[in-house]
Design a protein with these regions (language model features):
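A flexible loop/linker signature enriched in serine peptidases of the S9 family
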Residues: 1-5, 20-36, 49-62, 71-88, ...
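Blade-terminus and WD-like Trp-Asp/Gly-His loop motifs, strongest in beta-propeller folds
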Residues: 8-16, 61-69, 111-118, 154-160, ...
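Secreted/periplasmic carbohydrate-active enzymes, especially glycoside hydrolases
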Residues: 12-15, 143-146, 174
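Conserved glycine-bearing catalytic or ligand-binding loops at nucleotide- and phosphate-handling centers
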Residues: 154, 172-175
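Short loop/turn segments that connect beta-strands within beta-propeller blades
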Residues: 41-45, 91-95, 135-139
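Hydrophobic, helix-prone linear segments
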Residues: 14, 39-41
Length: 176
């Protein structure tokens, strides 16, 4: 919906472009919050809706390092812009989708793959934005930071994380 590069992802083999799109026109476009993720095949020109039947915002796809999985942010209901942002993962070989944030009563935003089994993200906790991770094999979500500040992004880089942190008393700074 906003048109940034975070709404695009290439599959590891470079043959498909995953993109976010709201394929509506006129008033329907203006009133709808239903976006989907589409896979455009660069070899044959075919486009497939990967999130068909999911009625809220589906956006910001990220592909796992091994190319097998795609994670994305998803809202459940159309027309409800304040809906919880869920963390979904799809197996790109089978099409199976899993909501890993079911039972996690917070948003999951700014998804980044650490390795093939870990997704790092930002979530709000008691009016602060903190760093969390999802361990895919167990489904366990772990909170890694706590304080009177906001983390605005997190990037896994091998054995360490880089993150930007802001507070009322400090401008944005990069931490590791």
């Amino acid at each position: 919906p906003w048109g940034g590069v975070e709404q695009l992802a290439w599959t590891k083999d470079g043959k498909k472009l995953i993109y976010t799109c709201r394929k509506k026109i006129g008033i329907d476009y203006a009133e709808s919050t239903n976006t989907d993720l589409y896979a455009y095949n660069t070899e044959n020109g075919e486009t497939v809706n990967l999130t068909e039947g999911m009625m809220g915002y589906d956006k910001n796809p990220v592909i796992s390092p091994n190319g097998r999985y795609m994670a994305w942010e998803s809202m459940e209901r159309e027309g409800y812009e304040a809906d919880k942002i869920r963390l979904y993962v799809m197996d790109l070989t089978t099409g199976e989708k899993n909501d890993f944030s079911e039972g996690f009563d917070q948003n999951a935003e700014g998804l980044k793959w650490g390795d093939d089994n870990t997704i790092w993200f930002i979530s709000d906790w008691h009016a602060t934005d903190e760093i969390y991770s999802l361990d895919i094999p167990t489904g366990r979500i772990t909170k890694h930071t706590d304080g009177v500040h906001n983390y605005t992004s997190v990037i896994p880089t091998g054995k360490m994380l880089l993150a930007t942190k802001v507070s009322m008393s400090k401008p944005a700074e990069i931490y590791k």
